[in-house]
């Protein structure tokens, strides 16, 4: 009776041991299949270093920094988040910068206005019955650009009765700052005599208080900015007192 009981006691233990052995063999087989799929290669020689990331004492080449990693196309690292937003923002910033550059550099108008005659100096030549007028006029130049402009030349003609009696020309006058106004003064010398010698007698009449004559002034101004040259012309009529020196208030 004792011997039979002992046999029955060892039989469940034997079955459990066989089951454990079967599981171990299956696990070992799976490990072998995994290793066969990704074989471990050991490099030996002078150009090898110890593998720091693998389990074991294998070696990998020293050219480890030159190894190329293959990343699947579905990897999220290849699809940064908000890419479309960043691209759209970059395009908008570029358009904004371009618009600002065009706005500030686009040539605006430079206006030239007549500011009147300021000073008239009168000289008489009695022998030749000649009246000499030194006429100082002023131009108002308004720069609407966001950069400076240069007044490169100015020329003026003084006419009396459709005849040129005086002229004035100058170059490299001034530089006008951005978004500002600038006054340019110039003096043209006019001589009225010869066929207009009657002007001398009119201007020297003592019993006339004001000796006004009408002169026609044609002025041309050249302005340069950013490689662009423009020309503005003015044509004005002025009353000039040829009897005495005068100054505009």
From Swiss-Prot:
Family membership, please give it: Belongs to the TMEM106 family.
PANTHER family noted in UniProt: TRANSMEMBRANE PROTEIN 106B, TRANSMEMBRANE PROTEIN 106C
Report the membrane topology from the UniProt record.
Answer: Multi-pass membrane protein; Lipid-anchor
Q: Where is the lipid attached (N-myristoyl glycine)?
A: 2
SUPFAM superfamilies given for it? LEA14-like (SSF117070)
User: For this UniProt entry, which segments traverse the membrane?
Assistant: 86-106, 197-217
Quaternary organization: Interacts with TMEM106B.
User: Endoplasmic reticulum: is it a keyword of this entry?
Assistant: yes
| Record-given protein name | Transmembrane protein 106C
Which residue intervals make up region (Disordered)? 1-26
Q: What is its main location?
A: endoplasmic reticulum
Where in or outside the cell it occurs: the entry states:
Endoplasmic reticulum membrane; Membrane
Task: For this UniProt record, give its keywords in alphabetical order, as a comma-separated list.
Answer: Endoplasmic reticulum, Lipoprotein, Membrane, Myristate, Transmembrane, Transmembrane helix
The Gene Ontology CC terms held by the record are: endoplasmic reticulum membrane
Q: Which organism is it from?
A: Bos taurus (Bovine)
């Amino acid at each position: 009776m004792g011997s039979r009981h002992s046999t029955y006691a060892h039989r469940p233990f034997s079955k459990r041991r066989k089951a454990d052995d079967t599981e171990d063999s299956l696990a070992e087989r799976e490990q072998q299949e995994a290793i066969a799929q990704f074989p471990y290669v050991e490099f030996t020689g002078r150009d090898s270093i110890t593998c720091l990331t693998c389990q074991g004492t294998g070696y990998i080449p020293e050219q480890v920094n030159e190894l190329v990693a293959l990343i699947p196309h579905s990897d999220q690292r290849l699809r940064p988040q908000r890419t479309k937003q960043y691209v759209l923002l970059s395009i908008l910033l570029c358009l904004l910068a371009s618009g600002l550059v065009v706005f500030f550099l686009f040539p605006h108008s430079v206006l030239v206005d007549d500011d009147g005659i300021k000073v008239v100096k009168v000289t008489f030549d009695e022998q030749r019955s000649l009246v000499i007028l030194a006429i100082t006029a002023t131009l108002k130049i308004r720069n609407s650009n966001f950069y400076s402009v240069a007044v490169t030349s100015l020329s003026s003609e003084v006419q009396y009765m459709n005849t040129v009696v005086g002229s004035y020309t100058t170059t490299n006058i001034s530089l006008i700052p951005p978004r500002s106004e600038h006054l340019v003064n110039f003096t043209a010398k006019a001589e009225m005599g010869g066929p207009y010698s009657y002007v001398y007698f009119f201007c020297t009449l003592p019993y006339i208080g004001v000796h006004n004559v009408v002169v026609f002034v044609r002025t041309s101004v050249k302005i340069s900015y950013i490689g662009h040259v423009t020309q503005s012309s003015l044509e004005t009529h002025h009353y000039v007192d040829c009897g005495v020196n005068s100054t505009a208030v």
